[in-house]
Design a protein with these regions (language model features):
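ABC transporter nucleotide-binding domains
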Residues: 5-7, 12-213, 219
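Short coil/turn segments
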Residues: 66, 91, 240, 266-269
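Short, surface-exposed acidic/glycine-rich loop or hinge patches that mediate macromolecular interfaces
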Residues: 73-74, 217, 238, 268, ...
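Short phosphate-engaging motifs
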Residues: 75, 201, 242-243, 270, ...
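Active-site-adjacent beta-strand anchor residues
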Residues: 95, 236, 264, 288-289
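ABC transporter nucleotide-binding domain
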Residues: 178-265
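C-terminal coupling/interaction segments
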Residues: 266-318
Length: 318
């Protein structure tokens, strides 16, 4: 098996019944996910992330292309027994207890009931729900319900796990535990596919990332690859009389911090010009540093059509 997940030219069009208007939810989407990795799918609301996952789970069907999971087409529905899924807004029968939920959903996957019960005990303890195992979930908080849904996705010991906004409703300790579990599962050879818009979570945990916008994959790679381009330069000098006015006149961006001016340059040529000008004014330069782009800045640039923050382009910023 070369890929745990493979999207091949997937397209999906939704048609409005009355207006006959077409909404292209997915347009020729293609990418792969390697076995034993943690993959993140990022994009704004309406980008097509959830539609793609629904097609992978056969909840929806493509108008073009196909998705393969664990080396097999999802048209072979038996593959779904090896898949775990945490939906964005999990809902369980409110009259059931936590134990009953895990036992029911685990058995629906076709797994041996003894394996399901063993795993249910394990994940209830790991996710701090053991004391609530016989409590009806109608009394659960949002965070407790989210942890139960995470346990549900794992209770049948799947090889591939889809997680849709897995840390929604969790406190910082809960989010850290989810990241820890995902890393452990990946080390065991399982593949994790995270659909999220929380950039910090994705940046912390994912091996590779794909960015989606308007139904298309607009970029993909590791965090290092996506953020490798320089985000400009920063020149730090002591704040002196008249210097800020001079920078304003030259339309150069800077910030004031702890008695120093942090002068921004969008590229090497701009940085060299600023350095030469400061030296001609006999101003001591304390440091010059290359600024690396963050995943957040890459995301904003990509989904907004390439427009970066004006402060990165040499405009005033006081």
């Amino acid at each position: 098996m070369s890929s745990a997940f493979e999207a091949i030219s997937v397209a999906k069009i939704f048609r409005r019944r009355w207006s006959r208007r077409e909404v292209r939810a997915l347009q020729n989407v293609s990418f792969t996910v390697e076995p034993g990795s943690i993959f993140g799918l990022l994009g704004p609301n309406g980008a097509g992330k959830t539609t793609l996952v629904k097609i992978a789970l056969t909840i929806a069907y493509p108008d073009q292309g196909e998705i393969r999971l664990l080396g097999e087409s999802v048209r072979n529905r038996s593959i779904l027994k090896r898949i775990g899924y945490l939906p964005e807004n999990p809902r369980f029968p409110s009259h059931l207890t936590a134990w009953q939920v895990l036992r029911l959903y685990g058995s629906l996957s076709g797994a041996d009931i003894r394996t399901v019960e063993k795993n249910a005990t394990k994940w209830l303890a790991r996710l701090d729900l053991e004391q609530w195992r016989d409590t009806r979930i109608s009394t659960f908080s949002k965070g407790m319900n989210e942890r139960l849904a995470f346990a549900q996705a794992l209770v049948h010991d799947p090889e591939f796990i889809f997680l849709d906004e897995p840390t929604d409703g969790l406190d910082p300790l809960g989010r850290m535990e989810v990241r820890s579990i995902c890393s452990e599962l990946a080390r065991q050879g399982k593949t994790i596919f995270i659909n999220s818009h929380i950039l910090a979570e994705i940046e912390l945990i994912c091996d590779r990332i794909a960015l989606m916008k308007s139904g298309e994959v607009i970029d993909q790679g590791t965090v290092a690859e996506l953020t490798s381009a320089r985000g400009g330069y920063e020149v730090v000098v002591p704040a002196g009389d008249g210097l800020s006015d001079w920078l304003h006149e030259k339309n150069v961006s800077f910030t004031f911090l702890d008695g120093h001016l942090h002068v921004q340059a969008k590229d090497r040529a701009s940085a060299n010009w600023i350095i030469d000008a400061l030296r001609q004014k006999n101003i001591e330069i304390e440091s010059v540093a290359v600024k690396r782009r963050t995943l957040e800045s890459v995301f904003i640039e990509k989904v907004s059509g390439g427009e970066e923050n004006p402060a990165a382009k040499g405009t005033k910023n006081t």
